[in-house]
């Protein structure tokens, strides 16, 4: 069997990520939407985002809520989505039933993705009816600033990235301030800045 898929034009800047948590009653409780700036192009991790900016897109989120709740889905859902400039619509490529490799983009925006599954399955907490949306603008990256800036597809995106750096709204899980290993600290200092 083969799956034939339309080629959606555009580089990494057209990619987006949506991470959701759906409780055991199939109600979406948490959502985080991100605009991918750059993906990994190495053989071992191809396609994994290495730079993401949190955003909110209610249309994408509402469609995803309907899909997840109407299908009886539970657990984490991590969507790979690409914007199609030909018609201005988003195309869903896949859904992963786990947190993505780059889920620190959620943490960097001030939210704890794991909290939802723990509260749901371990503590059996009652959730508010309102869906929590990770709406704090933040740049997640695991590559040097110069690389992120080099791959911004538009002047507007480049300015947004520069502004986030100026405002200190950048999260990099490799650049951990509490790190005590001198080799790791030197690596971060010389290769990540």
Predicted regions and their residues:
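Short secondary-structure junctions
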Residues: 1, 71-74
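Glycine-biased flexible loop/turn sites that connect beta-strands or occur in inter-domain linkers
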Residues: 26, 87-88
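A short glycine-rich, hydrophobically flanked beta-strand micro-motif that places a catalytic Asp/Glu
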Residues: 5-6, 74-86
């Amino acid at each position: 069997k083969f799956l034939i898929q339309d080629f959606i034009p555009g580089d990494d800047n057209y990619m987006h990520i949506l991470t959701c948590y759906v409780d055991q009653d199939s109600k979406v409780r948490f959502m985080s939407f991100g605009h991918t700036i750059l993906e990994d192009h190495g053989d071992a991790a191809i396609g994994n985002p290495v730079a993401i900016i949190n955003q909110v897109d209610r249309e994408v989120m509402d469609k995803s809520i309907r899909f997840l709740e109407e299908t009886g889905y539970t657990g984490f859902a991590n969507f790979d989505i690409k914007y199609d400039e030909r018609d201005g619509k988003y195309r869903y490529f896949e859904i992963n039933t786990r947190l993505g490799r780059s889920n620190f983009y959620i943490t960097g925006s001030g939210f704890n993705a794991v909290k939802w599954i723990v509260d749901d399955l371990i503590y059996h907490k009652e959730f508010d009816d309102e869906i929590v949306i990770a709406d704090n603008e933040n740049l997640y990256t695991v590559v040097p600033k110069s690389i992120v800036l080099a791959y911004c597809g538009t002047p507007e995106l480049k300015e947004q990235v520069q502004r986030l750096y100026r405002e200190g709204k950048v999260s990099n899980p490799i650049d951990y301030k509490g790190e005590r290993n001198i080799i790791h600290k030197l690596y971060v200092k010389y290769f990540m800045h």
